[in-house]
Amino acid sequence: MYVVKIGGSLLTNKDGYCAPNREMVRQYASLIAKEWDRLSGNLILIVGGGSYGNAVPIRYNLKDASLPWREQDLSMMTVKMFEWLSLVTEIFREEGVPCYPFQTSGYVITDDKHPLRYFIEPVQHVLETNVLPVFSGDLVFDLSRKFTIFSSDNIPELFVERMRLTRVVMMTDVEGVMRFDQDGHERTLIPTVTKENFREVLLCTGPSRKQDITGGMKNKLEALLRLAERGVEGVITSGSDPEALLPALFDERPAGTFIRPWVNNMRRQKADVDCVFGM
Ligand SMILES: Nc1ncnc2c1ncn2[C@@H]1O[C@H](COP(=O)(O)OP(=O)(O)OP(=O)(O)O)[C@@H](O)[C@H]1O
Ligand SMILES: C=C(C)CCOP(=O)(O)O
């Protein structure tokens, strides 16, 4: 099973308000349509929040339940997110990819931002039907915080216990995880993240330079590190050319930053997991 997250920085104008880049969505849809025989039943798609997921909570004070939000606005994150998921589903359908959108607050409950209970069985049915499951972040209900904003970067971890994930690819608006020189001008790509260097690489990551409330590159890398210690390969790479998707999914050493797992997925059992990062 492969999971690809296409960043909101690619599929929307991230500094706007609910401003989709329909042409980019269509290009990804058409590429996946061409490869559908190979991908159907093996691929889960996640779309980033972009100017939906990161702008709506600011407009309606829903970034955090401690803010003065209004009850009549509680629905707005989910309504707008599902508008975005529906648009993606519609474009994929027009291009010949059968999709099914999942609304995240309907199947996940968190406690202090961490997923506590979630129901993945319907996703397995969608995959068995050779339909592409499509996910996004959302406002989700939280036992200790009332609600929280759940990033699309954290969706892949919901599948790891139930499915044998091979690789999770995150396509975004930079080449991968970059290291900046001291005056912040020169930057070089970090090609590989391992059990040995992940602490140092994490120090290079930070928030997004665009409108973003979920932690930018840092949250992305942390999510992929937790997956690495469950035996899942991770890739962070540029998706400004949608043609980069297939090599990112299938090449042994894809462009961008490769996060090499430090347990063997094939033999992985709970007790085997060598957790040095966070699970
Ligand atoms: N070390 C780093 N290397 C590369 N980018 C970094 C680094 N640290 C922070 N960033 C920022 O992280 C951004 C990518 O994260 P961001 O969450 O904005 O992307 P996305 O996943 O495409 O969007 P969305 O979260 O809306 O889906 C980059 O554009 C950059 O501004
Ligand atoms: C999508 C929501 C609700 C939050 C933001 O999501 P992300 O930009 O995909 O991390």
PLM feature spans:
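C-terminal catalytic "cap/lid" subdomain
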Residues: 1-279
